[in-house]
């Protein structure tokens, strides 16, 4: 129950337990640092984490601008990421443990987002805090959380000495899962 409770705290930052379990426990820990499979390596076009990702001219400046974008991580959870991930994961029939019905998962996502907005935006305004102070506090909270989470994630998997192995033509990896974890972390 402790693990379930602690995992549920992701809702405080607008995350979703199902999405986190699939992205982190299934995709990331099964396919750690494998481009195209580990979603932690996919930051869209703006940041390039691996040599396999397409290179754009602006990537030569990413060491200067990426840290500012890291703070937007939990904003993305709140606004778009959870909806996109859930659609994608349900389409692929991915789950961690016993699979819940799509209707239950979508209902949970929508209700927790409504509760989230109610607690962090509506309630402070209702109790008399001016809207602009609420928005500043909301931004600072999210930016700080996003920055901390992103830096912790990147230090674990996207540093100079980690590797990004790719499967051979048959889709097989050259190392066992445990050895792969050591090389990629």
Annotate each predicted stretch with a short phrase.
Residues 1-98, 169-185:
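Membrane-embedded catalytic scaffold of the fatty acid hydroxylase/desaturase
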Residues 16, 78, 82, 90, ...:
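Transmembrane helix-loop junctions in multipass membrane proteins, especially transporters and channels
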């Amino acid at each position: 129950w402790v693990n379930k409770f602690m995992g549920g705290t992701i809702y405080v930052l607008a995350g979703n337990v199902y999405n986190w379990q699939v992205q982190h426990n299934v995709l990331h820990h099964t396919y750690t640092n494998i481009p195209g499979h580990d979603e932690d390596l996919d930051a869209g076009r703006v940041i390039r984490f691996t040599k396999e990702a397409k290179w754009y001219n602006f990537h030569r400046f990413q060491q200067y601008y990426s840290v500012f974008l890291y703070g937007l991580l939990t904003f993305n959870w709140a606004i778009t990421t959870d909806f996109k991930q859930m659609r994608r994961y349900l389409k692929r029939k991915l789950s961690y443990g016993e699979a819940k019905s799509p209707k239950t998962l979508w209902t949970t996502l929508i209700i927790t987002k409504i509760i989230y907005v109610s607690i962090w935006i509506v309630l402070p305004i209702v109790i008399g805090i001016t809207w602009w102070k609420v928005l500043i506090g909301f931004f600072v909270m999210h930016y700080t959380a996003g920055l901390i989470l992103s830096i912790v994630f990147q230090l674990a998997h996207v540093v100079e000495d980690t590797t990004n192995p790719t499967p051979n033509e048959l889709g097989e990896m050259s190392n066992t899962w445990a050895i792969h974890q050591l090389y990629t972390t």
